[in-house]
């Protein structure tokens, strides 16, 4: 049985999607509550919806982030950027006290931030980093 673990942000994911829903609801409620004599031009409507869509795309990027460790290596999705790093290329994982997220360090001294593991998630983040460190070949 292959050893596969996936880590996703806890609180940040909930906050990202909740903010997206709240933003949409407030926009619709305000739009419906405006008096009839107040209306937006087409350009204003387009600008408003483009800004809302941009914010929703950003929030979805936070929510969809993950770190997946399997027998071959680590797969990282930070927002819309994807990395696949084999275990043989990984030197270790660093997460200092108070750090917002851990960092994967490669043998070439490249660094990949692991946004899916949020330091604010406390024990979950410490457990995830301990697991990832245990998988690095000696």
PLM features per residue range, with description:
Residues 1-40:
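N-terminal membrane-targeting/pre-transmembrane regions
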Residues 14, 88-89, 116-121:
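A short, sequence-level motif marking secondary-structure junctions
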Residues 40-51:
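Hydrophobic alpha-helical transmembrane segments
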Residues 53-85:
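Conserved beta-hairpin
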Residues 100-103:
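Short aromatic-glycine-enriched beta-strand elements
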Residues 106-138:
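A membrane-cytosol interface segment of integral membrane proteins
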């Amino acid at each position: 049985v292959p050893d596969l673990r996936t880590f996703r942000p806890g609180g940040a994911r909930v906050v990202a999607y909740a903010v997206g829903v709240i933003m949409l609801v407030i926009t619709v409620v305000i739009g419906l509550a405006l008096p009839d004599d107040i209306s937006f031009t087409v350009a204003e409507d387009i600008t408003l919806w483009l800004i809302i869509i941009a914010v929703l795309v950003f929030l979805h990027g936070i929510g969809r982030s993950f770190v997946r460790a399997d027998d071959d290596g680590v797969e990282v999705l930070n927002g819309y950027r994807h990395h696949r790093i084999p275990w043989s290329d990984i030197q270790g994982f660093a997460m200092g006290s108070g750090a917002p997220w851990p960092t994967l360090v490669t043998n070439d001294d490249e660094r990949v931030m692991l946004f899916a593991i949020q330091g604010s998630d406390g024990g979950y983040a410490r457990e995830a980093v301990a697991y990832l460190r245990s998988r690095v070949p000696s």
